[in-house]
Amino acid sequence: SAIVHAAEVAGLTQFVNRHPQGFDMLIGERGESLSGGQRQEVAIARAVLMDPPILLMDEPTSAMDFSTEHQFKLRLRQHAAHKTVVIVTHRTSLIELADRIIVMDDGRIVADGPRESVVEALQSGKVGRAQ
């Protein structure tokens, strides 16, 4: 089903399967019974379930540990192979998902281009702060 697929992409499957009530569990107001990472996974699953042509994610892994984030990146790459995904993040570990990177500083674009070009410019110090 679409719900199971969305849960798989978001990384919720194991958590849901361990819970005695499964998908019928109560999670409380604003997900208060969930960890920060689980709340992010629920939000991601809800977005995936809508199947939008463009998926906008703001700091989608900020509450995830390294292992959880790594598994999420693998699942997202497979799910979003033919979609436009915009990720707003401070985590450089998500750069590998990008075809294009836009770097902003103080509300201004200071770099924009293919991932390899922007990463090279950043590493060589060719990208400065906004003036």
What are these model-predicted stretches?
Residues 1-29, 73-74, 82, 120:
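ABC ATPase nucleotide-binding domain helical subdomain, centered on the C-loop/LSGGQ "ABC signature"
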Residues 49-53, 82:
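A short, proline-enriched helix->beta-strand linker immediately N-terminal to the Walker B motif
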Residues 55-58:
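Catalytic Walker B motif of ABC-type/P-loop ATPase nucleotide-binding domains
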Residues 66-67:
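Helix N-cap at the start of a conserved alpha-helix in ABC-type nucleotide-binding domains
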Residues 78-87, 95:
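Conserved catalytic loops of ABC-family nucleotide-binding domains
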Residues 112-113:
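ABC ATPase "signature
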